[in-house]
Amino acid sequence: MAYGWNGCGMGVQVNGSNGAIGLSSKYSRNTELRRVEDNDIYRLAKILDENSCWRKLMSIIPKGMDVQACSGAGCLNFPAEIKKGFKYTAQDVFQIDEAANRLPPDQSKSQMMIDEWKTSGKLNERPTVGVLLQLLVQAELFSAADFVALDFLNESTPARPVDGPGALISLELLEEEMEVDNEGLSLKYQSSTATLGADAQGSVGLNLDNFEKDIVRRDKSVPQPSGNTPPIAPPRRQQRSTTNSNFATLTGTGTTSTTIPNVPNLTILNPSEQIQEPVLQPRPMNIPDLSILISNSGDLRATVSDNPSNRTSSTDPPNIPRITLLIDNSGDVNSRPNHAPAKASTATTSTASSNNLPMISALNISKGSRETLRPESRSSSSSLSKDDDDDNDGEEDGEEEYPDAFLPNLSNSEQQSSNNDSSLTTVTGTSGDNSFELTNDSSSTSNDDYACNIPDLSELQQ
């Protein structure tokens, strides 16, 4: 028997039978796997890649097997061959997995396993197509076994078990025809159609009335009105009066809210204003009413003197200072430096009414009073001593007149600075007149600066 390079020949048994194989087969059972074309190996590897079937095939390959004696159909005695052990272990399977991870994703692990197996071992140990087919049947990989039998060897598919996972599953469609019983569509199920007339007999419509509508009359307990009397509408509750009253209430509150502007109410500081102004007058938006700050202090003092027993009543807010006491006549303040006896006569009344409040009106000094003080400071040294004594007397009177005032006397500071400058003439050796003129010029300038920085509180009385 002559074999070609691909192992093709005549007289090869197929599944134990003496059947002849035509020239159409590619390979024989004795053809080594390293002689099979790469395209066929690739197609076989694609089948073994499903569900990692190559692992199962690699785990059952016997060690030291004589492939020339086991290549024939039914010549492989698997239990006797595995006594020598298996060719590959789990470590070898793990190495193939690690090698496949370093390769491109399209690389087949089954193809790597076949490439390693077909080139390993000696001449009689390298696998053949016949050994591959028998090992696939032993591993119950019947899809790959059918591919090798049909495409490689042109043989019939190997026998499969009757039951189990390897049993043959028929994928042929049923060709039986089902008979339809049309007797059930007889006219006995359409009793009402015959009563529709001759026109309904030739109708082919699907929306036909095939039912017997028997209306069941039921006696209802609700009394039915007679046909002559018209129906009477049920009485309804009239809510118009309540609605109108609610609407009027809402309207009244709406108008009240619109008339009252968003202005802070400062009348609580002065209870007399609440009596004098019972009705709120419309004021500009966001402008506080400062008129309560400018009120007649004489009215308040008269009210306090007339009602000494009602000082703790609920009309006067507790712990609220009377701001109107701060606003006095600026003309009286201007006349204080020139009329000392008048100050002494009014000291007791102002002290009683001050109530530990600073006399801010003392700052409101007109320019005329300041100018009258300047010629006195520019007089000779003899007149300065006299003015000094007068000012000291004025200081004592001022302290008695304003015991609670903590404001500095600008005239005293001006004259004290002039005295200090005149005393410096004895140290520097300069004339007293020259140094006094320079000092008075500087002091007058400083007084002008103080006059500019003093706010004019008389504007609150406008």
Curated annotation (Swiss-Prot):
Protein name: Protein Tube
Spans of repeat Sequence: 262-269, 286-293, 319-326, 356-363, 453-460
Location of region: Disordered: 218-265, 301-462
Keywords: Cell membrane, Cytoplasm, Developmental protein, Membrane, Repeat, Transducer
Function: Plays an essential role in the Tl receptor signaling pathway that establishes embryonic dorsoventral polarity; the signal directs import of dl into ventral and ventrolateral nuclei, thereby establishing dorsoventral polarity. Tub recruits pll to the plasma membrane and protein-protein interaction activates pll. Also has a role in pupal pattern formation.
Origin: domain of life: Eukaryota
One record GO biological process: lipopolysaccharide-mediated signaling pathway
Pfam families: Death_2
PTM annotation, UniProt: Phosphorylated by pll.
CDD domains assigned to the protein according to its UniProt record, in alphabetical order: Death_Tube
Bias kind Acidic residues: ranges: 387-403
Death domain sequence ranges: 27-152
Compartment(s): Cytoplasm; Cell membrane
Low complexity composition-biased segments: 249-259, 342-354, 409-424, 439-449
GO cellular component, one term: cytoplasm
Residue ranges, annotated region (5 X approximate repeats): 262-460
Record's keyword annotation contains Cell membrane: yes
Record's subunit section: Interacts (via Death domain) with pll (via Death domain).
Sequence ranges of Basic and acidic residues compositional bias: 368-377
GO molecular function, one term: protein tyrosine kinase binding
Biased composition (Polar residues): 301-317, 355-367, 425-438
